[in-house]
């Protein structure tokens, strides 16, 4: 490796926008490392991080309010290029001597920015830009050493620049796909203005992670809880590439997995990739612990506690394991840090965000803790994991434990597994699987009268659920073709003995959640 992939870096200060993580993902897509910190970070931390550029995010506050967030003064004293986005532009303008005012006209949605003059931020872009706005306040007077470089019909200063100091502000959101030239604008800032190189690639991330794992664990042995999900699977491949047979994976089959999932995990990681895997068949133990429990939160906690107990028991059998590998990813770190400190800046600390016992007396190996989910999937492909596994729809940690409503019984899980497998199989066959964001089946603990041949039956009901979403914060129910739904329903009722009725969930989020429990 010729250059350290962390040497060139962008700092993003978070003012609370729902799009802030998207800004970070876009910078990473461009090929440059970045971190996301809270707006009120200490000057010493910025100095230590030594960024090549700083981006001030959007946010829900109003600069006109007395105690609203402000960028640390050092941001403007550091000599580093700065890009302010939406609220970030407003606080930049106000802090550097301009004026911001509230507006009676809130600008939300599409707008056309007329680019004026020549600015590095709009290099190689047309004079009119379709952008995405989301603001109430607006800059009404720019600082003395700035020039206007963009406007809309209702926003006189949609973009401003101080080319000498390399300060730029845009009132719109370049990070969202609705802003057609947004990625080019971010590239212009990150690569052009800040002078960064594209060092952050899937290949370089893997090379860096493998080197760091080797340096961290040396000749010690490592244990990993392998679930077959995206994160733990990619961790398994990375750690195995670094230390080979010194990695032992523990796969706990809790009886709450999808059809044949346990065997698929063993076939792929044991037979195909040659990893050391211990399979623990703990179905009876989980079902016994869940007996009589119908409250969703109680079920979740029970499943979590039993998993920890089982994993702890297995880890103690591996006397030489000194390290625990986990699939912690960057959003976990941000969320965990924010909940503990109110700030999103603790990427270097190694707190346990995975819920495993604090007394395990093992060091943590977390090779994905700097990565977003889309980056994890990309390096998974590079490591040889199959596309259909990496891009599978999300599956909840408690598994079928939250897709069987009420009390969990083996009979219910077995019926649900088979019904769900039919639904997913038909989605693939109809080329619909990748057109929906998440699809699954839910077991309802109610019986319904049905007719089979000349006889009547009184059997269980399942609900099909399919949604379309960008961020899983909001979702629309998927308008699947009636003929398709009819085919799935007929197959389930005819092929899964014990189910007499199939319904389709047409609830959006909000008001409903995506999962039923």
From Swiss-Prot:
Top-level division of the source organism's lineage: Bacteria
- Where's the GMPS ATP-PPase domain? 200-392
The EC designation for this entry is 6.3.5.2
Please tell me one Gene Ontology term that the record gives under cellular component: cytosol
- Pfam families, sorted: GATase, GMP_synt_C, NAD_synthase
Q: Which residues are listed for ATP binding in this entry?
A: 227-233
Q: What class of enzyme is it?
A: ligase
Keyword field: ATP-binding, Glutamine amidotransferase, GMP biosynthesis, Ligase, Nucleotide-binding, Purine biosynthesis
Q: In which pathway does it act?
A: Purine metabolism; GMP biosynthesis; GMP from XMP (L-Gln route): step 1/1
Record's catalysed reaction(s): XMP + L-glutamine + ATP + H2O = GMP + L-glutamate + AMP + diphosphate + 2 H(+)
Q: Which GO terms describe its molecular function?
A: ATP binding; GMP synthase activity
Segments forming domain Glutamine amidotransferase type-1: 9-199
Mind telling me which SUPFAM superfamilies this protein's record contains?
Adenine nucleotide alpha hydrolases-like, Class I glutamine amidotransferase-like, GMP synthetase C-terminal dimerisation domain
Q: List the disulfide bonds.
A: none
Q: Which positions are catalytic residues?
A: 86 (nucleophile), 173, 175
The protein's matches in NCBIfam families, at most eight in alphabetical order, are given as: guaA_Cterm, guaA_Nterm, PRK00074.1
Q: Function of this protein? A: Catalyzes the synthesis of GMP from XMP.
SUBUNIT field:
Homodimer.
Q: Specify the protein name.
A: GMP synthase [glutamine-hydrolyzing]
- Organism (species): Vibrio parahaemolyticus serotype O3:K6 (strain RIMD 2210633)
